[in-house]
């Protein structure tokens, strides 16, 4: 029965074998490792490659989605068992220190129009932005990205060695190209109350491009949780525990850019039906154009 699991529905196999689910799972737990190697040889090879290609970032659920994308339909429990057998595990979430750019009321404070509506129906309609820092022995880098809250895609970003409005300007210039390419006529952009987002030029830029400005309430991180989740995942998957492996700030900057490219193009996500942000966007936009 074990060798048929990858090909047939579990319930059908149980009925044919006249076994209860509990009895089968008990026998499976007692199965020797060589049995798993023999029955799941193709899947084990795929799991090892997927985990390696993700730079050991994927846990069993993301590995499962990646397998599904390759036509291998194993459930999460089987993938978990096989990864345990292979002694593979993903990067574990952990808390991170949030960079704080709040300097009081130094400009315009916009209302919280987003109001924690983090699941827009269409791509390119609702965005979030913030800044985070990466510190190594040589110094610090600051990342300023904009995320599409529908697709989780980082649509524009800038990396700098110092925080300044020049960095925000560079990010906005790249964001402008995205808006033009996708013919975005109106959208919402959410941020915290950092001084950059109260700046007159930032507010005027949004208004000029017909973008609705929204801000978190003071000291309320969860109002901008989408971008915070991205920062947390990014740091767990490419930075924490690896700080000493970066030769210098140039090396760190390259790693940040490589990660964002990988995240957008390849990193699968449960929210996105097991697709990467870019693939989900393409699928969503195709669906919209066909309606």
Where do the language-model regions lie?
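Conserved, non-catalytic sequence blocks in retroelement Pol enzymes and Pol-derived host proteins
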Residues: 36-37, 118-119, 136, 193, ...
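RNase H-like two-metal-ion nuclease catalytic core shared by retroviral integrases
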Residues: 102-105, 191-193, 199-200, 215-235, ...
């Amino acid at each position: 029965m074990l060798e048929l699991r990858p090909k047939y529905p579990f319930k059908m196999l149980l009925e044919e074998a006249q076994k209860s689910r509990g009895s089968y799972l008990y026998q499976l737990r007692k199965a020797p490792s060589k049995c798993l190697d023999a029955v799941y040889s193709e899947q084990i090879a795929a799991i090892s490659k997927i985990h390696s290609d993700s730079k050991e970032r994927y846990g069993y659920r993301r590995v499962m989605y990646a397998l599904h994308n390759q036509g291998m339909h194993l459930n999460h429990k089987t993938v978990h068992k096989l990864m345990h057998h292979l002694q593979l595990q993903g990067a574990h979430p952990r808390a991170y220190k949030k960079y704080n750019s709040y300097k009081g009321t130094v400009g315009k404070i916009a209302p919280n129009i987003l109001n924690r509506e983090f699941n827009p129906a269409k791509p390119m309609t609702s965005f979030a932005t913030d800044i985070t820092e990466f510190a190594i022995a040589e110094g610090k880098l600051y990342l300023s990205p904009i995320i599409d809250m529908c697709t989780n895609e980082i649509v524009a970003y800038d990396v700098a060695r110092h925080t300044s409005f020049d960095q925000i300007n560079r990010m906005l210039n790249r964001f402008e190209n995205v808006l033009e390419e996708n013919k975005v006529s109106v959208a919402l952009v959410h941020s915290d109350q950092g001084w950059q987002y109260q700046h007159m030029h930032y507010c005027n830029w949004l208004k000029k491009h017909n973008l609705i400005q929204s801000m978190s309430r003071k000291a309320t991180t969860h109002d901008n949780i989408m971008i915070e989740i991205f920062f947390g995942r990014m740091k767990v998957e490419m930075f924490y525990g690896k700080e000493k492996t970066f030769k210098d700030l140039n090396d760190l900057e390259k790693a940040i850019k490589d990660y964002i490219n990988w995240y957008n193009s390849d990193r699968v996500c449960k929210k996105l039906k097991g697709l990467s942000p870019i693939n989900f966007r393409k699928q969503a936009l195709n669906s919209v154009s066909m309606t």
